[in-house]
């Protein structure tokens, strides 16, 4: 896992140079949003179960996927879906705090699409639920933090698509 600071420093180090104006600007932007990120993470942490619950209600609960024969029909499958959404929310929050999506590749996305396909998990419905979670989260944390979190939810969706 990297964070925005490590990413900027590593990039300059690999090139054997000091931080240039662009690198300094990236660091300034990251530090300027630090308080926003921490407040958003605090709000998300305090409301994680409700965020997931609302996202499921908005996107999956009354669809064919939860009816008999649907992929989320049994309690076990439904619980697995809730667990996965909670996992995505947690790791998107970590990535937002770090200002870098690398943790999503390392801990979430590597091999996930293939695993879902082999298990018959509907990726479209998963992406729909993540998008609903993005919307619910933005409503809680506000426009600026919601936009920042949206980057990482979208990153997960792109990795699954």
UniProtKB/Swiss-Prot annotation:
Sorted UniProt keywords: Antenna complex, Bile pigment, Chromophore, Electron transport, Membrane, Methylation, Photosynthesis, Phycobilisome, Thylakoid, Transport
- Residue numbers bearing the N4-methylasparagine modification: 71
**Location relative to the cell:** Cellular thylakoid membrane
GO BP terms: photosynthesis
Subunit (UniProt)? Heterodimer of an alpha and a beta chain.
Entry function: Light-harvesting photosynthetic bile pigment-protein from the phycobiliprotein complex. Allophycocyanin has a maximum absorption at approximately 650 nanometers.
Q: How does it sit in the membrane?
A: Peripheral membrane protein
What protein does this entry describe?
Answer: Allophycocyanin beta chain
GO terms for cellular component: phycobilisome; plasma membrane-derived thylakoid membrane
**Post-translational modifications:** Contains one covalently linked phycocyanobilin chromophore.
Please tell me where (2R,3E)-phycocyanobilin binds in this chain. Answer: 81
- InterPro entries documented for this protein: Allophycocyanin_b, Globin-like_sf, Phycobilisome_asu/bsu, Phycobilisome_asu/bsu_sf
User: Pfam families given for it?
Assistant: Phycobilisome (PF00502)
Q: Assign the protein's first listed, main location to one coarse class.
A: membrane
Family, according to the entry, reads as follows: Belongs to the phycobiliprotein family.
The record's SUPFAM superfamilies line, in alphabetical order, gives: Globin-like
